[in-house]
Amino acid sequence: MTNAPIPRLALLLAATTLSASPLASAQNAERQLAGVTRNQNTLEIATNDGRYLIKPYSSTIVETTFIPRGERLDPASHAVILAPVQVQATLEDEGGRLTYAIDGGISVTVDKQPFRISYAYKGKPLVAEKRGFGRAGGHETIEFALEDGEALYGAGARAVGMNRRGHRFQLYNKAHYGYAERSELLNYTMPVALSSKKYAIHFDNPQIGWLDFDSRKDGTLRYEVIGGRKTYQVVAGDSWDHLMAGYTGLTGRQPLPPRWAFGNFASRFGYKSEAETRAVVDKFAQEKIPLDAVILDLYWFGKTVQGTMGNLDWDRDTFPHAEKMMADFKARGVKTLVVTEPFVLTTSKRWDEAVQKKVLATDQAGKPYTYDFYFGNTGLIDIYKPEGRDWWWNIYSTLKRGGVTGWWGDLGEPEVHPSRLQHATGSADQVHNVYGHDWARLIAEGYQQEFPNERPFILMRAGYSGSQRFGMIPWSGDVARSWGGLQSQMEISLQMGMQGLAYMHSDLGGFAGAVLDDELYVRWLQYGVFQPIFRPHAQEAVASEPVFRSEATRVLAREAVWLRYAMLPYNYTIAFDNEQTGMPLMRPLMFVEPDPAQPAERSTTYLWGPDFLVTPIVQPGATRAEVYFPNAGSVWFDFHTGQAHKGGILETVKPVEANIPVYVRAGAFVPMAKVVQTTRDYTGREIDLHYYHDASVAASSGKLYDDDGETAGAYAQGKYEIVRFDSTFADKRLEIGFRTETGKAMQAKERAFALKVHNVQAKPRAVTVDGRAARFTFNAQQHLLEVQVPARKGQAAQVAISL
């Protein structure tokens, strides 16, 4: 395990020191410019009370840091990994102001009196400081001016509405047990604000505080923090795609998860024995419900909920042959995941070892800090000590070599984290928001050293800006098993995707409460088909697994799982796009709706990838649902019936029991597969390629990404194939082309495509494949044309259809 230091947090200054420092009383009116120095890319502005460093990372990203007089620069960032590039920029002194302009991008203007920094992008005003770095009410603060009508997003995982302007958010990762349709504070609090003007401000400091999105209704974005770095980055974009690319380029992109992560999980709180776990896996096979992983909650290391946390080893009474069990599951294509927590109870088997090896956080005297919480009297692993990191990683490594495939990190806010507790790099309050982030880093770096060819699966309940680069799979916490709980989930996932964490998902069916509601369960699973991870999970009083529900419910749930597996090629492809560009899997309508007057700022309908429009049913007994079809001039087809809908229109549709309303964009290519019992059996050799034809689409394109599903960095190593599709339509002739890009280290795969063209109104006059007449089938009732494209390596073909 690496001993590389985790970035050290600046220690919190004593209140007496702060009150005497220049920062304590500095306001814009008192801050005066004293000089300007340009050092390569960085612009240094001296003031009477400190200095500013303005540093471009690219033409669209600029970082601003204030260093009060008497303090030193703290260059360490937990969030930022992008290396600044050399940019072409000009500096002009216009007497009353300085303008530092980056060619083709952001310009920074510094007004001299009163001192004020503002930002523009390509000549258009973006955002400006309203009140510079200062101190008020026991916090270090900075304020920005907002325009009327400007919407704000971000601040982590919340459930308050898509436009979060008007709220003041605490920055303190915290579990909210049993929340439903509303929660202002959850497990991921992130110091980032995104604007409808397509810019983001990231406050590069994980210490606890507040992010105020104009709660006082005075046009102010206000950041308040107990101490630490006074640094923020402004990211600008021409479009939402561009902004997502910029922000994730700054903070890191999510590596592609293993393919099995897009399958179905069996999970509950929890399986209490090896025999029970084996029976559950057997039941999925018997019911022909696909399964790729089983997750073991805390009973894997102890027989009781309380008193055993921190054992971090198999309870051999209840799991006597754990390694054999996991090997048997693996042979069936089912992976095993186990829960781990950062707490070591004083009653656990490892307590004495943890104390002796000095792996725990301490009190002021340097002794292990112990305290009571729900699970018992405990200490907390200090991952900021080399001893703590190495000790914990060695446990992971041992479990991994025994057969564990993935990790569930629970309670990682940390759930109870007393302010008096000390870590190696600072107080609990200084590291609290970044603890889960650095926990994921510990596992990711351990894999890079010991298992460099494998993709880790790291399911975490808490994190920070940039956690996605460690492969973190976030979930939305202990949501109530209620309709209100379901209603909040789309917003949480959409917002987190905009903040880089594109795999935010919920416990399907809801977690908290002994509620048996089959309709709620089915609707949640139907939504789950179109969320990043398909993982039913709940308290054990009511079964979370479809195999243990009523027959009618089981049938509907099976259909949802089958559709999830059929969509594996499409889902894996949009996950690859997320790795490459940072675009989230779930996307708000505003990403594609150009008209701000339209109702695109809603979470009740969203985009899945670039092609699907999804409206989950979130009310019991719903007989109607509103769907806004974005982008006037576009056409959307009902995924289940083929009915066409025009874009730019808000419609009321009638839901059916078998599925939720889902639509596909005209011009979309959707690769799908035959359903398999486990993704291990997916080969990618036979693909159903659905193309949604419409006369309004003159040209379109799509792709299929494929690799072995398990090798870390497969694309970068050239171990991949991309099959690209394109279409043109003119003079009643539709042409669809296939061409394959094979990576330098990939052996070309022989693939056959069943091309299925939707919305064909009459039987074609002729169909050719590579210039030769081809057989086809035409379903006049469904308006569906099917053409077989023969299997070949490095697939390259041209299909021409005369309509």
Model-based region annotation:
Residues 1-11:
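Bacterial N-terminal signal peptides that target proteins for export
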Residues 6, 23-26:
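N-terminal metal-binding scaffold of metallo-dependent hydrolase/deaminase domains
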Residues 15, 19-21, 571:
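N-terminal signal peptide c-region/cleavage motif recognized by signal peptidases
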Residues 25-251, 255-260, 269, 274-276, ...:
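N-terminal accessory segment at the very beginning of proteins
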Residues 27-29, 126-659, 664-665:
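Catalytic-domain carbohydrate-binding cleft regions of carbohydrate-active enzymes
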Residues 627, 651-653, 774, 787, ...:
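Generic detection of short hydrophobic beta-strand segments and adjacent strand-loop junctions
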